[in-house]
Regions:
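C-terminal domain-boundary segment and adjacent tail
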Residues: 42-45, 138, 202-274
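Active-site beta->alpha N-cap acidic-glycine motif
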Residues: 1-70
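Active-site-adjacent pocket scaffolds in enzyme catalytic domains
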Residues: 105, 109-110, 116-219
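Short glycine-enriched, charge-decorated loop/helix-capping segments at active-site entrances
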Residues: 21-27, 90, 239-245
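Histidine-centered divalent metal-coordination motifs
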Residues: 10, 77, 81, 227
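Metal-dependent polysaccharide deacetylase catalytic core of the NodB/CE4 family, i.e.
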Residues: 16, 44-125, 136, 141-148, ...
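Generic structural signal for well-ordered alpha-helices
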Residues: 34-38, 61-65, 93-100, 129, ...
Length: 274
């Protein structure tokens, strides 16, 4: 029997990497791209956790209701796609509360989990963990790699309870569960990200499959993630965006379907039995 893993979607629009005040300049594509993902999940009998921007919930409440009605889980991805490393504690918590209030009002269910935009919990923003522990049962923001954009290379690679002052240290007394993004460890080189998103588009499929299978062979589960824009071969060009936003979009849907076929997935809530 295949090991159950966790599937997640970071539910945001293609322009959400831009400053919030510029978002109104762009035409939304999130309904089209999210429905594509929902249909792929239905076809492959997959349930997922949708880390949802409060902004998206505010603009498209019927989309959130549809996701919820199909048996998927709604979790928080903040309200305005904040980089936690660049804001104050007060601004972060206010944004977080706004997101949770919007999503809980739409679904009528408690929001149990969070993922930081840009995976922006690292050594500059460890303070955020204490705030997260007040609102959530789990977090999935830590990426145990080191890239120019994010990551904590020496963080645990498997699910754990993080110390709230230094979350790369485990602390069994903490109620918050951390679910790090999937990596493959290569001697000398270190951890290679294989969790989805850009890496789904960039890495050869055979290597991603190999790395994820290796996790399951060790009797561990992994979490995978996708953005709606990752499957949008017609994503509009944005001048501020670099090559990695558009790389290999034409082949991404086919690769994602292979992931859905080759592994078993469920929601984080169902996996954790919470």
């Amino acid at each position: 029997m295949k090991i159950k893993n966790m599937m997640s979607v970071d539910l945001e629009d293609y322009f959400c990497d831009l400053p919030f005040e510029k978002w109104s300049q762009y035409e939304s594509r999130v309904l089209k791209t999210t429905n594509k993902i929902l249909n792929l999940f239905e076809k492959n009998k997959v349930k997922a956790t949708f880390f949802t921007l409060g902004y998206i919930g505010e603009k498209f409440p019927d989309l959130i209701k549809e996701i919820d009605s199909r048996g998927h889980e709604i979790a928080s991805h903040s309200y305005a796609h904040l980089d936690i490393r660049k804001v104050t504690r007060e601004k972060f918590e206010d944004d977080l509360k706004k997101s949770v209030e919007i999503l809980e009002k739409i679904t009528g269910k408690k929001i149990l989990g969070f993922r930081a935009p840009y995976f922006s919990i690292d050594k500059k923003s460890f303070w955020a963990m204490e705030i997260l522990s007040k609102y959530f049962k789990y977090d999935s923001s830590i990426f145990p790699v080191k890239t120019p954009l994010y990551g904590i290379k020496n963080a645990p690679r498997n699910m754990y309870k993080p110390n709230l002052i230094n979350p790369i240290i485990t602390d069994a007394k903490i109620n918050l569960i951390e679910i790090p993004m999937a990596t493959d460890r290569i001697p000398i080189i270190g951890n290679i990200p294989i969790a989805g998103g850009f890496y789904l588009r960039f890495l050869p499929y055979f290597y991603m499959k190999y790395g994820l299978k290796k996790i399951n062979k060790n009797k561990k589960s992994f979490i995978f993630y996708i953005y709606p824009k990752d499957l949008d071969s017609e994503m509009p060009k944005i001048g501020e965006y670099t090559w990695h936003h558009y790389h290999n979009l034409k082949n991404s849907t086919k690769k994602f379907e292979k992931i859905l076929n080759d592994f078993e997935f469920t929601t984080i809530k169902e996996y954790l039995k919470i």
